[in-house]
UniProtKB/Swiss-Prot annotation:
Family per record: Belongs to the thymidylate synthase family. Bacterial-type ThyA subfamily.
Entry binding sites for (6R)-5,10-methylene-5,6,7,8-tetrahydrofolate: 219, 313
A molecular function (GO) term: thymidylate synthase activity
Annotated localization: Cytoplasm
InterPro entries: Thymidate_synth/dCMP_Mease, Thymidate_synth/dCMP_Mease_dom, Thymidate_synth/dCMP_Mease_sf, Thymidylate_synthase, Thymidylate_synthase_AS
Active site (UniProt): 196
Pathways per UniProt: Pyrimidine metabolism; dTTP biosynthesis
Species of the source: Listeria monocytogenes serotype 4a (strain HCC23)
A single cellular component GO annotation: cytosol
Task of the protein: Catalyzes the reductive methylation of 2'-deoxyuridine-5'-monophosphate (dUMP) to 2'-deoxythymidine-5'-monophosphate (dTMP) while utilizing 5,10-methylenetetrahydrofolate (mTHF) as the methyl donor and reductant in the reaction, yielding dihydrofolate (DHF) as a by-product. This enzymatic reaction provides an intracellular de novo source of dTMP, an essential precursor for DNA biosynthesis.
Subunit structure: Homodimer.
Signal peptide (residue range): none
Pfam families: Thymidylat_synt
Full protein name: Thymidylate synthase
Length: 314
């Protein structure tokens, strides 16, 4: 997608070198927007392969209100492992090798990387096989799914923001309050990672449903391709339920950054030429957005260039 390649190029040429929480360092810009017409095809990277099934299982995890990585691991999805693992290795229950700054150390020290990978595999196995362990150390706190589906009020009640949103689109499509927020200041300290994609709003016009996402922190190379595909998929799922066509996905970013250890990968991607976008295929069986399974969602005509691997910063 040209819009995404333009973002990478813009940050490389105009970004500011900044330190960051992870210690990796970034090239960053503040305030950037991309627009995708969802009628022109499904917006997923074609200049590198994005594992679409992982996008699907993560979104369904959010939609279920789940915050435990066990569901993800059951679907061979490892994208949240590091944050749960970090909580475990900082606990008194962890008795293995020192895992301080495991992300950076694994990148720089091949011997440590082997030790880290072995500890991670043991952790994943315990999450899958030991329910009590999973309940304690698979939890990431009140992150996206919890805020979307069970926002706690000061009165001790809960708000299902997503169900309320869908009902409002059906009954009052001209509302300017078609908003879901994952940014709950009270819960931030207890989250494994505060919401990066923190608020989204829907808009209905001319029989089409559009979505705008505000993302406070955007990891351009690893995270943003997932975010684009995830919110485009969410827009399609909701549009199907409320009987509308899809319109645009607008992606607004606050701190949009390239990690310093992703620069060579970015240059490799910029050397590639975008291909035709695929089409999204949805099963007719699910009655509501909350009834979908991974097998109900697929892409037709997705023929991307090979994946480009890059380290994750935790």
């Amino acid at each position: 997608m040209k819009q995404y390649l333009d973002l990478e190029k813009y940050v490389l040429e105009n970004g500011t070198q900044k330190g960051d929480r992870t210690g990796t360092g970034t090239i960053s810009t503040f305030g950037y927007q991309m627009r995708f017409d969802l009628q022109e095809g499904f917006p997923i990277m074609t200049t590198k392969r994005v594992p679409f099934k992982l996008v699907v299982s993560e979104l369904l995890w959010f939609l279920h209100g789940d915050t435990n990585i066990r569901y993800l691991l059951q679907h061979n999805n490892n994208i949240w492992n590091e944050w749960a693992f970090e909580r475990f290795v900082k606990s008194d229950d962890y008795k293995g090798e020192d895992m301080t700054d495991f992300g950076l150390r694994a990148e720089r020290d091949p011997a440590f990387k082997e030790v880290y990978q072995a500890e991670m595999e043991k952790f994943k196995t315990r999450i899958l096989e030991d329910e009590a362990f999973a309940n304690k150390y698979g939890e990431l706190g009140n992150i996206y799914g919890k805020q979307w589906r069970e926002w706690k009020t000061s009165q001790g009640e809960t708000i299902d923001q997503l169900a309320d949103l869908i009902e409002m689109i059906k009954t009052n499509p001209n509302s300017r309050r078609l908003i879901v927020s994952a940014w709950n200041p009270e819960d931030i300290p207890n989250m494994a990672l505060p919401p990066c994609h923190s608020l989204f709003q829907f808009y209905v016009a001319d029989g089409k449903l559009s979505c705008q996402l505000y993302q406070r922190s955007a990891d351009i190379f690893l995270g943003v391709p997932f975010n684009i595909a995830s919110y485009a998929l969410l827009t399609h799922l909701i549009a199907r339920e409320v009987g509308l066509e899809v319109g645009e996905f607008i992606h607004t970013m606050g701190d949009a950054h390239l990690y310093n250890n992703h620069i060579e990968q970015v240059k490799e991607q910029l050397s590639r030429t975008p291909h035709k976008l695929p089409k999204l295929v949805l099963s007719d069986k699910p009655a509501t957005i909350f009834d979908f399974d991974v097998a109900d969602i697929s892409l037709d005509g997705y023929n991307p260039d090979p994946a480009i691997k890059a380290p994750i910063s935790v």
